[in-house]
């Protein structure tokens, strides 16, 4: 079995947000196909990993530029006879390249966004420097795993990486079929009781970590644009906003409910009638949209909020609206509440972790096999 060393230089266990889930669940399912050893930070609860971990990295920000880790990681690679070194994002790429030169190990970059573009959309002046560095690391890697076809196509065109050395390993979900109608009814009853929502009101949902600027901007659009448009068309609804970072918000519209961080977000996905996703900026696939669709929940989204998700495998559950047409957005929300479509099996074949990691492991296992004369 091929041995992969995964460098994960930040806390991700327990996995509370989409980015953390993307790392935790990819590695958990990937470890069913390869022998995986995670080199992680000391703050993680590594008992939750499901594979061997080594808490090597400190909490200091200097860990990203600390050359003293190189020797220790090289020792681990030689001891474990590893064939591949995988990094999350490009930030430790410089270190990984030195390690590959010293050990001969092959390098995988597990990309979650085109990072430079993500920082460009959030107004960081130094995004171009990151763009040059990110492209360099991807070109030097033996393989790059991208979160979406859009990211992979961008890297091929602008970073000039090899098509043969890249593949899409998207964000996934653990279940392979939607919840039953009975499960959804029970969830809806519980959530409506908790938040005092009447059966006559449509339950609309948005989820995010609101300290992240694109998510906070989306919340402001819901508060200032979408809810007034829903009120104008006379829709009866409650807009549930789940996630941390809005503790100081006190919206004047009684239809908006700030639920804050919730222990079981899947209960809310099952309970809702429509998932609303007016995200305008930020890179990568929107994990909350994948989770919503996987719960057979109708989604109304902007184009940016649906990047990486093929409408053709969503069975009519995904509606995409042009940015800034919030009156049409509100109309589509109302239309989605009367839809009777169901998420098809093709969606789960694309977004289930078992399928995603099996495809990635096939590349690694093939690379790890010795050449035959």
Q: How does the language model describe each region?
A:
Residues 71-75, 101, 125-147:
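Membrane-proximal helix-turn-helix segments that form the acceptor-binding/catalytic region
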Residues 150, 169-172:
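Carbohydrate-associated surface elements
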Residues 267-284, 297:
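Acidic donor-binding loop of glycosyltransferase active sites
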Residues 288-291, 298-303:
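Short hydrophobic beta-strand element within catalytic cores of glycosyltransferases
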Residues 338-367:
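A charged, aromatic-enriched C-terminal amphipathic alpha-helix characteristic of glycosyltransferases
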Residues 5, 100-119:
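Active-site proximal beta-strand in glycosyltransferases
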Residues 22-23, 28, 173-252, 258, ...:
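Conserved catalytic-core segment of nucleotide-activated headgroup transferases in glycan assembly
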């Amino acid at each position: 079995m091929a041995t992969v060393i995964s460098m994960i230089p930040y806390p991700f266990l327990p996995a509370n947000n989409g980015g953390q889930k993307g790392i935790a669940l990819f590695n958990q399912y990937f470890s069913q196909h390869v022998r995986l050893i995670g080199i992680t930070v000391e703050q993680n609860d590594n008992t939750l990993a499901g594979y061997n971990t080594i808490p090597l990295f400190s909490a200091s920000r200097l860990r990203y530029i600390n050359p003293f880790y190189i020797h220790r990681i090289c020792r681990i690679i030689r001891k474990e006879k590893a064939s591949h070194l995988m990094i999350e994002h490009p930030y430790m790429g410089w270190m990984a390249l030195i390690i590959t030169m010293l050990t001969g190990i092959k390098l995988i970059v597990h990309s979650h966004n085109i990072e430079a573009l993500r920082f460009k959309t959030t107004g960081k002046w130094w995004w171009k420097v990151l763009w040059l560095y990110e492209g360099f690391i991807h070109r030097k890697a033996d393989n790059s795993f991208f979160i979406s076809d859009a990211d992979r196509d961008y890297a091929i065109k602008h970073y000039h990486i090899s098509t043969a050395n890249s593949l899409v390993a998207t964000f996934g979900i653990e279940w392979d079929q939607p919840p039953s109608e009975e499960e959804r009814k029970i969830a809806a009853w519980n959530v409506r009781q908790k938040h005092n929502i009447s059966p006559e009101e449509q339950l609309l949902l948005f989820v995010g970590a609101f300290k992240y600027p694109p998510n906070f901007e989306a919340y402001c659009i819901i508060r200032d644009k979408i809810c007034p448009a829903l009120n104008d068309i006379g829709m009866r609804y409650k807009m549930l906003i789940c996630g941390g970072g809005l503790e100081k918000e006190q919206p004047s519209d009684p239809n908006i409910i700030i639920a804050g961080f919730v222990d079981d977000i899947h209960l809310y996905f099952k309970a809702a009638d429509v998932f609303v996703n007016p995200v305008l900026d930020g890179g990568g696939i929107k994990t909350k949209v994948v989770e919503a669709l996987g719960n057979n929940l109708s989604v109304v989204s902007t184009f940016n909020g649906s990047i990486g998700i093929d409408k053709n495998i969503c069975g009519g559950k995904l509606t995409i609206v042009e940015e800034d047409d919030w009156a049409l957005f509100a109309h589509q929300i109302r239309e989605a509440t009367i839809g009777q479509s169901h998420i098809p099996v093709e969606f789960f074949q694309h977004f289930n972790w078992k399928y995603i990691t099996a495809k990635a492991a096939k590349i690694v296992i093939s690379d790890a096999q010795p050449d035959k004369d």
